[in-house]
């Protein structure tokens, strides 16, 4: 079976005053094209589907468009909530969606829900864990000592029967770290050593029973601890710190013979996000200007503050998001 792993869509997000809905539709259409090219069986969406707990109408319509397109292609969808999402809003209509093989787990109810499928000699079980806090999980396991995010996730997995004869996938939205090292945090909210976006660190070893772990929460694509525990990263650049990142989705092929094979499929945005630095006159010189429709963060090295620098800059780069000085 072939799966496409993505996460951190942040539908409805803005860059400064700029609406990204058109850019997000463009990248989702690109992902739909990849599902056709690669004959994808299922799409794993690892949380932060929306950018805000109360998403805009445009954001909800865009998600509907994406899910309906996947359903029309008979592609299964496995989607969990992230810390940016409203559990109840994302869960709305989940029972109806399930009839079209769109499986949504947005509210933790004490059970790590699973969907199982057989493909030839391979049985694949996809487990879905929405974003959870210790206080939510403690209620369901009163005999467990749960005081942290790590405790909470370990308790859930410990109380779940996992058949190791299957190929087991987990879709989860949390801050997961390796032994002695943290993930690269470009664009991923705050960057504390023990938490990201107020989400505490979880040890990757709690996922030992899973053949592949589809992570969401960190915007930079990367493995954590072992090859089969992956952050897909966000499909678009959402902050200046992501300017040098290359965006992609993870293509996962699972078979009884070869186990789990992981490939990266690059994504190309409609408009890139770039950080440029130099004197204003040099940056706006025609010979130095390229892709003027890109989203631009500019750092000026002029010795004096330039009057209405933003207005001047936007005459050449209309989608300039921010200007600062060095």
Tell where the protein language model's regions lie, with residue ranges:
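Metal-dependent catalytic neighborhoods of phosphoester/phosphodiester hydrolases
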Residues: 14-16, 47-67, 81-101, 106, ...
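Conserved beta-sheet core of the metallophosphoesterase superfamily
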Residues: 182-260
């Amino acid at each position: 079976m072939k799966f496409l792993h993505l996460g951190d869509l942040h539908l409805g997000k803005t860059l400064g005053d700029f609406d990204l809905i058109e850019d997000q539709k463009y990248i989702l259409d690109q992902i739909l094209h990849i599902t056709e090219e690669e004959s994808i069986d299922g799409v794993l969406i690892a949380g932060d589907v929306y950018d805000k707990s109360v998403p805009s109408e445009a954001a909800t319509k865009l998600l509907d468009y994406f899910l309906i397109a996947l359903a029309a292609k008979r592609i299964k969808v496995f989607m969990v909530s992230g810390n940016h999402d409203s559990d109840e809003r994302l869960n709305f209509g989940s029972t109806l969606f399930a009839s079209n093989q769109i499986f949504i787990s947005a509210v933790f109810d004490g059970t790590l829900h699973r969907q199982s499928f057989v493909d030839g000699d391979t049985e694949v079980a996809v487990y879905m864990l929405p974003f959870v806090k210790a206080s939510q999980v403690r209620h369901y396991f009163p005999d467990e000592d749960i005081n942290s995010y790590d405790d909470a996730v370990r308790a859930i997995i410990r109380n779940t029967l996992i058949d190791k004869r299957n190929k087991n996938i987990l879709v989860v939205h949390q801050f997961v770290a390796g032994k002695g090292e943290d993930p690269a945090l470009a664009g991923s909210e705050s960057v504390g050593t023990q938490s990201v976006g107020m989400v505490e660190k979880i040890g990757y070893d709690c996922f030992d029973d899973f053949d592949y772990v589809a992570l969401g929460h960190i915007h930079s694509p990367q493995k954590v601890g072992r090859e089969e525990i992956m952050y897909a990263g966000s499909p678009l650049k959402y902050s200046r710190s992501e300017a040098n990142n290359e965006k992609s989705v993870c293509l996962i092929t699972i078979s009884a013979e070869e186990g789990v094979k992981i490939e990266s499929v690059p994504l190309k945005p409609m408009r890139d996000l770039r950080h440029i630095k130099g004197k204003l006159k040099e940056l706006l010189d025609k010979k130095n200007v390229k892709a003027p429709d890109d989203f631009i963060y500019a750092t000026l090295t002029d010795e004096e503050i330039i009057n209405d620098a933003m207005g001047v800059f936007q005459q050449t780069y209309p989608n300039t998001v921010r200007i600062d000085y060095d």
